[in-house]
Amino acid sequence: MKQYDAKKILNIALAGHSGAGKTSVAESMIYLAGLSDRIGKIADGNTVLDYDPEEIKRKVSVITAVAPIEWKNTKINIIDTPGLFDFEGGVREGMRAADSALIVVSGKNGVDVGTEKAVKLADKMGLTKMFFVNGLCDESARFYRVFETLKSTFGPAVCPVIVPYIQDGKANVYVNLFEYKAYKYENGKMSQTDMPDMGDRLEGLRVAIKEAVAETSEELLDKFIMGEEFTPEEIILGVSQGVKDGSILPVFCGDAQNTFGINQLLDSLTWLAPSAADKGSEFGVDTNGDPVEISVNENGAAAAIVFKTVADPFVGKLSYFKVISGKISTDTPLINMRTGNQERITKVLTVRGKKQEDASYVGAGDIGAIPKLQNTITGDTLCAPTRKVVLDGITYPNPTYTMAIYPKTKGEEEKVAAGLAKLAEEDPTIKFGMNTETHEMIISGMGEQHLDVIVSKLKNKYNVDVVLKEPKIAYRETIRKKVSVQGRHKKQSGGHGQFGDVWIEFEPCDCDDLEFAERVVGGAVPKGFFPAVEKGLRDAIQKGPLAGYPVVGLKATLYDGSYHPVDSSEMSFKMAAAIAYKNGMPQANPTLLEPIGSLKAMVPDNNMGDIMGEVTKRRGRVLGMNPGEDGMQVVEAEVPMAEMHDFSTYIRQVTQGRGSFTFEFTRYEDAPANIAQKIIENAKNEGNV
């Protein structure tokens, strides 16, 4: 593929709800561009872009993939993103590399939650937005109903460009409203045909265009209000400018699996979609933390953002990047601004799906890949040593679904950790680590399906079988009553014996773990043994009397005892303290504490009742409600951590994916008696007490 100037490069992310046909649209584009001899089908597992074994097995996109094509002297970098909410991290990666988002909408299902989320994310990332209504050959598809929903959901900026003429249930004629020409698809080919009689509907669509164009400037708005007609040049210029500045959201349509409407879509993109150069510049910070502007200029100092990483044990590591300024080749010196180290570029590639081709260089505005950058991760900035700058990285959603992960074969814990570390290089929404208290390896992701894919990849890529279990809860124990007890340790076994004798007062306090004090008089216990008594208690409180959980909020005061001048030792008094603890705790009204977390659930207004009811069902307390962003409501509550395990699944289901939440530990409080009893019984059955 030849080199293109940034003015002739389009970086377009395909986004939208799962099942809308994003990958099919991309495959149709690849086919029409002459880069494939057939249109890949997801059901057959033979697409260019869904090449990952997990995608082939599940018949759904789970990673972001890139495919450059050439169309009418323009290079289009197609960035196909996942639609499932569990893989939102991939959508953010794809949009970071894009300059516009083509949001694919099902002609049958219409505007889904994934449509809304894609629009919001594109807005947040400053991308131009366009719509493609797909699947119109399905008899259940209803383009005009979907168009009206787009308009009512996203406002008057929604503007029709290509619309179908449906006759006898067939959607194989498409009208370009700008050209005022009709095209028919027959036997795999597109040809111009007579304009169909669409009656008042066509006039209504042209009015929709005028309304959208009128919003692009005050002059055109005045003209529209006065009832004057726009010239064809004004319409084309207004739409082109409006699309690029975001004041117009163009709508295309067709059926990707049959290539219907895809030619017209590609033709329109070459003049409607913003080029890499249209963006003008990106902002970053220099080494002093001061903001700097980096122009999209091939003659500038090199600067690129790494937006995706593939870490495959068989193929090796591959870092996908977008060049903002300059050129990147094997001769380009590059600094990784996160590590401060220079990276050695052995090869520069262009990638189409899993196919790699050597490139002499990748210029400003374009996308490429570099193999074997071992210390580079997604979000890193690579730049010339002569102009050090850090570009905006990628903000990932916080994982909300957590499980404990165990190897099926004992002793393979390190193998699991190594595999997860590699997978986390590819997918930063994976978080994992060892819970030192419960002695479990914990993994967090975006949902059940996300973790299911991780388990499958561990087996297929890193040859380690694992099982997921509900994570253990880190309970605590405390006391509610003041007691005084003796701890006496005496042992005689020939020679020097062991002797330690202490009287300790145990009482509740506000401390985090143990507060140790002494008020011994008359040398009943020598001062030199005080540290041993404290050490014995600190070791002992790691296991409470009820269920073996650590004890907190305990004050222990050593106030009396006795010693033997020969047999007493630090170990003797350490043992005596442990005996006092063991004797005293059951008498001090021990209580089980459970961790409580602070919940903030962002949900649509009509789901507030569902969420509040669910909080109550999970033994939580609703603290209040506040208006949030984008018309959402924020429900604030406190909920026991033990009740939150599957809350991410619940909130996604009840809000159809619109809701989100944050949850973090706040404090411990008494567990209800019935709950405490179950926990204590389980601990006894597991041998923890």
Where are the language model's segments positioned?
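Structural and coupling elements of P-loop NTPases
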Residues: 1-689
